[in-house]
Each structure stands twice: as C-alpha cells, then as structure tokens.
C-alpha cells in the first residue's frame, strides 16, 4: 500500500537568513547531537553568494499537493525554516521514506595545494548541499556558537542514519558531480547518502531548467504515489519527457537513478 509513504520536502530556501533568526529557530534542536563540520577559511569562497531559486518553491509545493491528494504524510520546509538542523533531525527513527531537497549543490574540483588543505583532500568535504542562511559562512562570515553553518557536506551526510529512507531526491545544480577515484567510482553526495543507508537516490548531472524539473518530478511522484516502484516511476517520467522533448535531451536526461 502506498499509505506508508511519508515525505519531507525542502525548497524555496532563503540562503540569506540572519544568524539571529536561525538561532531562535534552532532552540528546538538543542538537545540533538549532530556531527558538525564548518567550512575552513580556505574553503570559503569570499565574494560569491548563492541566489534564491524561485523554481524550487514551485517544485516542492507541487509535490506537496500530489502527496496530500494521495493522503500521504508530508512535511515541507521552505524559506528560513529549511535549516541544516531540520535536515539532520531526520536521523534514525525520524528518517522518513522520502526526502526531497531542491537546493543548490556544489562540488570543488581542484584544490590549490596549501598547508591547511589536508582536510579538504577528502572528496567528502568538498561536496555539499545548501540550507537556510548558508551565505554567511560561505562568504567567510563569523560562525555562530551553537548553530550549524547551513552547508551540509557529504561528510556530514555520511554520518547520518537514514536506514528508513528508501529514496532521496537531490533536485539541484551540479549535485551529481563527484570525483572519479580509480575504481571507487563517484564520491560526493551519492556515496555519502548510500553510506547513510538510503536505498535509492535521484540526482541531476547538470542544471535542468526549473519548468522541466518540476514537470519531471510531477510525473515521477504521481506514478510513485499510485503504487509503482521507484524504478518504474522513474522510467515512466523519463519516457514521458523523452516523448515530449525528443530533440531537447538537456531538459530531462540529466536525471539519474542510483541504487
């Protein structure tokens, strides 16, 4: 029966949330023990910052509506509420069947060699997802005591326990990119979430336009919540998009299902 699906959605995230606001919201997570990791000074990217993704709010809102229609249990975190703490809270017994994260993802490819770089030689420190307020520490701002930095690294994800989670969808820019390391294959987030115990991962290998991303996800979830398996629903969404955009594979071919 599909009633067992419960789903947690993150999207429409505010990357500029003030630390004071996050600190207030983080109170409810204060007794939880997370593995935390901060950006090192060298990793922070100085001037650049992450922009709001309006398409992601539409995307998760659509999925929420589909889930509610099917009478599934759904939680959605957007804006300032889409905190890294909130994601880490989905650990262990709180781990839902499906987690859908629609946000910026990143991967640092090459590293200038420097003394402090040992930590960053590990590819798990160089891939991640962005949550509320991430711009502060991304731009080298001061870390606030007792607060996550809004940047979930693959290393932090590896330390979560997501055995109850059948599927994680990373609907984001560049999240599929990893570092090819001999026969070990692709590191990065994919590896991290597998280590955390997730069975299936859907991710994109390049940035797909917002409208088509939302469309793909809608096709996928409608089928999934109607009782199809994850691979069946994924194949259906792919074929539907392929028929609709035969000459524009960039609009759908980026999505991959990893088991």
Question: How does the language model describe each region?
Answer:
Residues 1-259:
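Catalytic cores of enzymes
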């Amino acid at each position: 029966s599909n009633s067992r699906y419960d789903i947690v959605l993150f999207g429409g995230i505010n990357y500029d949330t003030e630390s004071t606001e996050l600190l207030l919201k983080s109170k409810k997570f204060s007794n939880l023990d997370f593995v935390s990791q901060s950006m090192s000074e060298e990793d922070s990217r100085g001037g650049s910052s992450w922009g709001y993704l309006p398409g992601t709010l539409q995307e998760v809102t659509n999925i929420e509506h589909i889930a509610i229609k099917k009478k599934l249990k759904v939680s959605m975190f957007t804006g300032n509420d889409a905190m890294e703490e909130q994601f880490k809270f989905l650990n262990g017994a709180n781990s839902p069947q499906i987690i859908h994260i629609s946000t910026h993802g990143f991967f640092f490819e090459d590293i200038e060699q420097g003394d402090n770089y040992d930590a960053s030689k590990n590819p798990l420190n160089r891939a991640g997802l962005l949550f509320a307020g991430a711009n502060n520490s991304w731009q080298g701002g001061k870390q606030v005591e007792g607060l996550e930095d809004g940047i979930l690294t693959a290393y932090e994800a590896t330390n979560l326990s997501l055995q109850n989670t059948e599927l994680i969808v990373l609907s984001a820019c560049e999240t599929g990119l990893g570092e090819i390391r001999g026969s070990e294959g692709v590191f990065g987030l994919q590896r991290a979430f597998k280590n955390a115990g997730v069975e299936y991962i859907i991710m994109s290998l390049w940035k797909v336009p917002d409208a088509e991303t939302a469309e793909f996800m809608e096709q996928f979830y409608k089928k999934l919540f109607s009782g199809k398996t994850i691979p069946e629903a994924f194949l259906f969404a792919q074929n539907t998009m392929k028929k609709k955009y035969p000459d524009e594979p960039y609009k759908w071919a980026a999505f991959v299902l990893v088991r």
